[in-house]
Regions:
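Mature-chain termini and adjacent capping regions
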Residues: 1-5, 13-253
Length: 253
């Protein structure tokens, strides 16, 4: 069943914006709203603005999925100059397209110059960014993908891992970084280059695979494989050529 509302609903929603109450969701749109009652979704067209208790959204066009009551929003799909701000979920994003699953708190943004910012982490990509706010999973893939926080800078074609809340801050506890050309990670006073860079907080080991370069304290070590132990502040580099000397450098400061 399809019902089409245009001018009446636009006026209604525009009027409500000046007096939105807690629990209400306000929508404005220049080209009207199509309501699909059986399928439980709305189509909002042209310069859409949504204000709610949990988030604010601006976009060219938006599809909203609801629960059975057509009251609670379960999913948002937005296209065109998308801006999404959610103090409740701690998310702020800009993108060409957006998909937000409300119950699972899973957000995906796509397109050139996409960005997703939380209180502790900044993420950028010309491909896509995905974050699950409940279990901490995240993924960035595409050109110019970057992840930045206070202590780390990562740039690669593919970045994925897990955030954990430690002392009310998001920290990376698992990380896989891949780039067929070269990945780059800067952590405190250490710069690392490799095609693959992995980190597991359980072992405190950063693993570097293929075309490895570690720059630290004025020293530059090159090889094919390397590990950096973040607990005892040491690292190793080795080469596939057995005639080359393996290097182990430890800094006890």
């Amino acid at each position: 069943m399809r019902l089409i509302f245009s001018i009446t609903i636009i006026i209604l929603f525009t009027f409500n914006i000046t007096a939105r109450e807690i629990g209400e969701t306000e929508i404005t749109t220049e080209d009207g709203i199509e309501v699909f009652q059986d399928e439980k979704y709305y189509l909002l067209k042209k310069n859409v603005k949504i204000l709610s208790d949990n988030f604010n959204l601006n976009a060219k066009n938006v599809k909203i999925n609801f629960d059975k009551s057509l009251y609670d929003i379960t999913e948002l799909n937005a296209k065109g100059e998308v801006n999404f701000v959610s103090p409740k979920f701690g998310l702020n994003s800009k993108s060409e397209t957006l998909k937000f699953e409300v119950i699972s708190e899973k957000l995906r943004v796509d397109g050139k110059n996409s960005e997703l910012i939380t209180k502790d982490i900044e993420m950028y990509s010309d491909g896509f960014i995905e974050v699950n706010n409940l279990n901490g999973d995240f993924k960035l893939e595409g050109l110019n993908s970057k992840l930045i926080n206070e202590s780390i800078f990562i740039k690669a074609e593919k970045i994925e891992g897990v955030f954990s809340n430690i002392e009310n801050q998001k920290e990376i506890t698992f990380l896989n970084v891949i780039d067929k050309k070269i990945s780059y990670v800067k952590n405190n006073n250490t710069e690392m280059y490799a095609k693959k860079i992995n980190f597991d907080n359980k072992t405190s080991i950063i693993e570097l695979i293929d075309n490895v370069v570690i720059i630290r304290n004025g020293e530059k070590i090159i090889g094919d494989y390397g590990t950096l132990d973040t607990k005892n502040n040491s690292y190793k580099i080795k080469s596939n050529n057995d005639t080359k000397v393996k290097v182990v450098i430890q800094n006890n400061e």
